[in-house]
Amino acid sequence: MKTNIKVFTSTGELTTLGRELGKGGEGAVYDIEEFVDSVAKIYHTPPPALKQDKLAFMAATADAQLLNYVAWPQATLHGGRGGKVIGFMMPKVSGKEPIHMIYSPAHRRQSYPHCAWDFLLYVARNIASSFATVHEHGHVVGDVNQNSFMVGRDSKVVLIDSDSFQINANGTLHLCEVGVSHFTPPELQTLPSFVGFERTENHDNFGLALLIFHVLFGGRHPYSGVPLISDAGNALETDITHFRYAYASDNQRRGLKPPPRSIPLSMLPSDVEAMFQQAFTESGVATGRPTAKAWVAALDSLRQQLKKCIVSAMHVYPAHLTDCPWCALDNQGVIYFIDLGEEVITTGGNFVLAKVWAMVMASVAPPALQLPLPDHFQPTGRPLPLGLLRREYIILLEIALSALSLLLCGLQAEPRYIILVPVLAAIWIIGSLTSKAYKAEVQQRREAFNRAKMDYDHLVRQIQQVGGLEGFIAKRTMLEKMKDEILGLPEEEKRALAALHDTARERQKQKFLEGFFIDVASIPGVGPARKAALRSFGIETAADVTRRGVKQVKGFGDHLTQAVIDWKASCERRFVFRPNEAITPADRQAVMAKMTAKRHRLESALTVGATELQRFRLHAPARTMPLMEPLRQAAEKLAQAQADLSRC
């Protein structure tokens, strides 16, 4: 509905406000009839004189670079010509959504199913570029949070709420006096408020790193994880204060480790890992966090080092990784990216099972390995320590002691034989001490022998695996299992399609519950920080909620857990099963896409494996040679230990 309210620009130009687009606590946003690419923000009450000066400066210094990344004031708006500032005009942000719609796996699967990790990487890069633009102009964002960023399907990012920025107006600072606790850096967590406090670029750089982490790691918070000490995990703000970065290289000391089934930080190259370590630990306060420009450069470089999985075009990851991290997570039941089927990369369409298997069968096994054996060495065993009797002498001593004891008893304790009692006692003491020391020496030598044998056997197994007959047979057995899996895929697909009837109700219900998002739900006692903690554990929708899953999040006791369970139950009560939609074409397509992906994965692995098996014999010498000298030393050590033990 049009308002037809008349307002004036700072130059006295009359404009007409159109329909109201949105309203917040501070003001409302309207279309402008005369400027279709701009909107007007009108405050509920005219801002103070200092805020009016701030807006006037921002409008006067607007340039193309700022307007490209920020919904920056283009002109101040007034109730009358030359009157007080009541609002401002800014670029219209259309065709974009809040950034959590991109980084949240649950939201992205529904709204942006075609967006893979390379898209997220570009979004993260553009977030950094928006910060760099603000900083280059001498300003600070200040109130960094996920609600201040809008992103489009072209990955372009726009910062909104620019009137809250900390603005440097030719030396006059207009402060940003608000903030969101779980985006506030550790060194500012104990501030009672931001009123009168000057923010710095380094404070911004904490929020920037956190946003980039959100985008690249599925919305997870870097300070949310599994507690390793009693006082960790109770409150996100406390964990931030104590630098409990869950993904840190020294996280055991910090008291938090990553949540289960989360994206590993090792997915990133070591230089980018180090940037997060710098941003989220004490060194970021002491020597500065990575700047926005540094993030732009690092992410641009990473974008040039990506590769696609052979199984799915949606699986894009850094080229330094050997295996696809998304496939590994899929196998754990964690789906970050949906493969819609039509984008599966095939193995080229030239896979012929019979041909590949013929390669396997034609592979020649390596010859038996000539390994160093302990028998090849004839070491001299170490003698027993001086004064220590061999076992057979101890036995003779014990026999003699027993015989003398019996003889003494037979002499009916005549006085002249009483002198034998201390002699027998001395013999008994010597024999007892000698026996105890002997047993300790034997135990020590036996343990040394066992360790040497274990080391030798381990090296033998290792050599056999990389270049021996055992390794060749094990690899061929594995390939045979793959071949059998490929042959069984048609039957497996039939069973999966037939099972759709049995699982129809649960699948419909699951899809229904996936439409209820925790981040917009009203759950008693569960505010933004606790919702961030749930998201870090992969709990984003009603479909993700289980009592056990919620209770593993620190801070969710019986009361809060029940509140989340009750919310899920309220969602479930709205579900109505539709039998006529029991099995949709999309359901069938999903099964067939899964089978196709599995076939391509097996075909590719079998092809590579067949080639490796053919080359096994050729490469065996090069693989075993580095291990031969350690094995020779282990064999010699074992022979010595055996000789030492034989002296006992």
From Swiss-Prot:
Domain Protein kinase residues, every copy: 15-302
MF-aspect GO terms: ATP binding; protein kinase activity
EC number: 2.7.-.-
Alphabetized InterPro entries for the sequence: Kinase-like_dom_sf, Prot_kinase_dom, YegI-like
Modifications made to the protein after synthesis: Autophosphorylated. Dephosphorylated by PphC.
SUPFAM superfamilies with a match to the protein in the record: Protein kinase-like (PK-like)
Active-site residue list: D143 (proton acceptor)
Keywords tagged on the record: ATP-binding, Kinase, Nucleotide-binding, Phosphoprotein, Transferase
Domain of life: Bacteria
Residues where ATP binds: L21, G22, K23, G24, G25, E26, G27, A28, V29, K41
Record's function text: Probable serine/threonine kinase.
Protein name listed in UniProt: Protein kinase YegI
